[in-house]
């Protein structure tokens, strides 16, 4: 068998394995779902709020980069922002 047919052969074997694989059905356990939901609700309160100054810090960094790349465009944007 030539080297160019190896990838085609592997692809055909892979497809045949998927087509002829035994079908399985997932079983849902309501107790596990209830516990997972309770854990998720309990942990949701522990998540902190993002720093409100993050957007302004990101905008300042983007403006610095823009000043280095295109000073005229940066000046126009800085005038619009204020």
UniProtKB/Swiss-Prot annotation:
Keywords: Amidation, Antimicrobial, Secreted, Signal, Toxin
Source organism, top-level taxon: Eukaryota
InterPro entries the record matches: Pilosulin
Subcellular location: Secreted
Residue stretch(es) of the prosequence: 27-52
Residues where Isoleucine amide is found: 81
Annotated GO CC locations: extracellular region
GO terms of biological process kind: venom-mediated paralysis in another organism
Signal peptide residues on this chain, from the entry's feature table: 1-26
First-listed, main subcellular location of the protein, grouped into a coarse class: secreted
Tissue expression remark: Expressed by the venom gland.
GO molecular function: toxin activity
Similarity annotation: Belongs to the formicidae venom precursor-01 superfamily.
Role played: Induces paralysis after injection into blowflies (L.caesar). In most cases is not lethal 24 hours after injection, but paralysis is irreversible. May have antimicrobial properties, like most ant linear peptides.
Protein name in UniProt: U10-myrmicitoxin-Mri1a
Organism: Manica rubida (European giant red ant)
Lineage, top ranks: Eukaryota, Metazoa, Ecdysozoa, Arthropoda, Hexapoda
């Amino acid at each position: 068998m030539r080297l160019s047919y190896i990838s085609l052969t592997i692809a055909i074997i892979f497809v045949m394995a998927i087509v002829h694989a035994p079908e399985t059905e997932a079983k849902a356990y309501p107790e596990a779902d209830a516990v997972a939901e309770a854990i998720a609700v309990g942990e949701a309160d522990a998540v902190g709020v993002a720093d409100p100054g993050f957007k302004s810090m990101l905008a300042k960094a983007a403006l610095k980069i823009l000043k280095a790349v295109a000073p005229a465009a940066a000046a126009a944007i800085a005038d619009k922002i204020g």
